[in-house]
Amino acid sequence: MDLKQAIAESIENSGVAILPPMDVKESMALLIENGVKAKTCILDPWYNKGIGGQLSDTEYDNFIRTLLDQSSLMSDIIYLWGFPEIIGPYVRFAPEQFKMTAWLTWYYKNCPSVIRGWRSSQNACIQFTKEGASLHPENFLNAQQELRFEEGKMRFIPGPTSVIEAP
């Protein structure tokens, strides 16, 4: 059984395929080479505080651009997560044939702080979509909306909110 078949079988049986630990660029190249397509690609890279210290801004920009470009070869929707001050500049890094669709904010109350001063109580996400990609808003409906959707009684399908509160 080749890798593409193994991934398809795993997704069919359990809804997910888990690759062994490896560098993200290697895993993406492996998936691309094997023709594996995903409905969405979710990226949550390290925040330039990796092994051996920090990369220069240019090196980190190139790292993020490579992740986004590789993701665009295997998915029509890409999410880039991180702290707002880290990912903010990457709004302009949409891969070719993609556009920024949304800036999502996930905030959490009662965030414990071990430092003095300001503490981050939110994460941000940039959503990039390929031209013509379906956003699947039906996946974000509440129970009442799901029922009306299934009965064909919705005048329009509301999109998800751009601010998500953590419980």
State where each predicted segment sits.
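Core catalytic lobe of class I
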Residues: 1, 6-167
